[in-house]
């Protein structure tokens, strides 16, 4: 009887010890949080089956303004890596990260190494609207920058789990190879539009326009984040006609009234694209460019 009790006690002790030591088994996936779906999608590609990824901001929400919720802090408290967009786009992420109280969190600025556009040359003040002092933060809309993000993801995942370093490196290289092939396809698809004049609602599309040789000749917002006046809209009407602009790209979280006015007055065609991909799966970043370039290519040269 005593031997039986001793055996039971040993078993219970072993289970208790296992529950303590087994909280994070070696086979556990690396948990990754990202500010944007684009960063999350690339992380899913590079990490493969070894990662569990989620995004804070959704594709149809304005990435400049995300409500900081306690639920986000709780989720981030359980992750190993946080992927920030950087360039002051996702400043709201700082409050989430701080509130998570996750001292082991590896915070990665995915903008490092990007050729940043629209850096202000002088002093930035409120009269200029929501101008980012470090430059335009929408760099992921040049697909070539996706490979830079993939390298950041590879390095962060390798740091979190060195045992899978070879896998992460191979996947990052595979991402680059697939990206280069797709970029060639997208360039060919968009070639007839090279040099045409376009209008955008916000400054989200500067990198996209540069990637495909599109000329942004005006924006619905006179300054980033500043609603247009009647005078500004009339000036845009005149500019659209003078420049023969055929395309207006608008984010879906902005109102339709002003783009529809410009459409009625000039015949310009409005395309509503989310700046970020809809999903966080490994192919969603590529699918986003597939959809946008396919739609725009039908506009003609």
Residue ranges and their predicted role:
Residues 22-28:
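Bacterial Sec-dependent signal peptides at the C-terminal "C-region" and cleavage site
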Residues 2-13:
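Bacterial N-terminal signal peptides that target proteins for export
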Residues 11-22:
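Bacterial N-terminal signal peptides
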Residues 28-301:
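Extracytoplasmic metal-acquisition and chelation regions
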């Amino acid at each position: 009887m005593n031997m039986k009790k001793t055996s039971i006690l040993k078993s219970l002790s072993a289970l208790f010890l296992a529950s303590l030591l087994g909280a994070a088994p070696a086979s556990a996936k690396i948990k990754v949080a990202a500010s944007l779906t684009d960063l999350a999608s690339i992380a899913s590609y590079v990490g493969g089956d070894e990662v569990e990824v989620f995004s804070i901001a959704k594709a149809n929400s304005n990435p400049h303004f995300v409500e900081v919720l306690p639920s986000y802090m709780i989720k981030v408290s359980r992750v190993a890596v946080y992927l920030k967009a950087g360039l002051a786009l996702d400043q709201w992420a700082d409050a989430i990260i701080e509130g998570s109280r996750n001292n082991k969190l590896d915070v990665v600025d995915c903008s490092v190494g990007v050729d940043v556009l629209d850096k202000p040359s002088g002093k930035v003040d409120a009269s200029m609207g929501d101008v980012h002092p470090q430059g335009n933060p929408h760099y992921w809309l040049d697909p070539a920058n996706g490979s830079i993000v993939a390298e950041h993801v590879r390095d962060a995942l390798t740091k979190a789990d060195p045992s899978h370093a070879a896998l992460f490196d191979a996947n990052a290289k595979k991402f680059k190879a697939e990206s280069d092939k797709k970029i060639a396809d997208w360039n060919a698809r968009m070639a007839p539009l090279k040099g045409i004049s376009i209008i955008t609602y916000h400054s989200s599309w500067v990198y996209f326009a540069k990637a495909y040789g599109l000329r942004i000749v005006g924006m619905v917002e006179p300054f980033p984040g500043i609603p247009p006046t009647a005078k500004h809209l009339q000036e845009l009407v005149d500019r659209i006609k003078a420049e023969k602009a055929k395309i207006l790209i608008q984010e879906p979280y902005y109102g339709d009234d002003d783009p529809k006015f410009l459409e009625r007055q000039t015949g310009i065609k409005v395309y509503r694209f989310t700046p970020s991909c809809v999903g966080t799966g490994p192919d969603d970043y590529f699918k986003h460019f597939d959809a946008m370039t396919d739609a725009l290519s039908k506009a003609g040269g």
